[in-house]
Regions:
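Non-catalytic, hydrophobic alpha-helical segments
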Residues: 144, 227-231, 235
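A conserved structural motif in NAD(P)-dependent oxidoreductases
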Residues: 217-228, 239
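Short C-terminal tail/terminal secondary-structure segment
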Residues: 244-258
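A glycine/serine/threonine-rich, flexible loop-to-helix segment
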Residues: 54, 182, 192-217, 227, ...
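Short-chain dehydrogenase/reductase
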Residues: 2-118, 202
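Conserved SDR Rossmann-fold cofactor-binding beta-strand/turn motif
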Residues: 186-196, 236, 249-251
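Catalytic loop of short-chain dehydrogenase/reductase
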Residues: 18-31, 97-136, 140-182, 194-196, ...
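Short, small/polar-rich loop/turn modules that mediate ligand/substrate recognition or access, typified
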Residues: 181, 186, 243-245
Length: 258
């Protein structure tokens, strides 16, 4: 293989879910991948979100589609839209997480059955469903990435319900890596350090969480949106063809300090 192609995304076709605004991890990934020559279909939640997202995606040539993963048929519809547009998919990035605020801000033991189930459905099961929907349209193999966080494997104050939900997501990633490996589809969880996104703003005392992370980080700073996108782009390249089933940290080294 030409070594130049190993680190290229030119001509690759991708689906990226979860843009809320220009601070979203999903947007950072979509922007970088477009700059690197990939073609991208991306999602925002609904028409209300589109007003904030489209001014940033349209100039980049990103095809923006509404997708509420809780709404029957919408996840399947966006996959079909991308496949009809591109003919195939080479990479898929899932950057969606949600829980009802009452459950997110309370203790895990107090989480409602419905709130817990919805958090898992939106944040975790939707990635497994993406695997089912996208794998048949990835004839050349490729990569599927989901976004997670350190609080999946250790207790992070105020992260609450999302901790066990992200732990479930990371387990799904590992099982999907086995189930899709025969199709040459690589599956990873990317674990960024805290950055101020719309989703993160729902976490109680998030400013305190960021300050703690910065104080612990060997690099003595927080990770940047572009750095999360850079790791994600690499994992979608042929250069990462020997890797699958991992949770990979991009957090300025915070994970190594515990």
């Amino acid at each position: 293989m030409n070594s130049t192609n190993l680190f290229s995304l030119a001509g690759k076709k991708g689906l990226i879910l979860g843009i809320a605004n220009d601070s979203s991890i999903a947007f950072g990934c979509a922007r970088l991948m477009r700059e690197m020559g990939a073609e991208v279909v991306a999602s925002c939640l609904n028409d209300k979100a589109r007003k904030f997202v489209e001014p940033h995606t349209q100039p980049l040539g990103i095809d923006l589609v509404n997708c509420d993963v809780e709404a029957e048929g919408e996840l399947e519809a966006i996959v079909q839209h991308a496949v009809q547009k591109f003919g195939k998919l080479d990479f898929v990035i899932h950057s969606i997480a949600w829980a009802p605020l009452q459950d997110l801000h309370g203790d895990v033991v107090d989480a409602s059955r419905e709130g817990f189930a919805r958090a898992v459905s939106v944040s975790c099961h939707s990635f497994a469903e993406l695997g089912k929907l996208c794998a048949p349209h990835m004839p050349d193999g490729g990569a599927m990435l989901a976004m997670t966080y350190l609080g999946s494997g250790e207790v992070v104050p105020h992260y609450g319900l999302m901790g066990p939900v992200k732990a479930a997501l990371e387990s799904v990633v590992r099982y999907m890596s086995l189930e899709l490996g025969s199709k040459n589809i690589r599956v990873h969880a990317v674990s960024p350090g805290p950055i101020l996104t719309r989703a993160a703003s729902g976490i109680a005392s998030f400013d305190e969480l960021m300050a703690t992370a910065q104080a612990k980080a060997p690099l003595q700073r927080l990770v940047k949106l572009d750095e999360i996108a850079q790791l994600s782009a690499f994992l979608c390249m042929e250069a990462a063809s020997g890797m699958t089933g991992q949770t990979i940290y991009v957090d300025a080294g915070v994970h190594a300090m515990d």
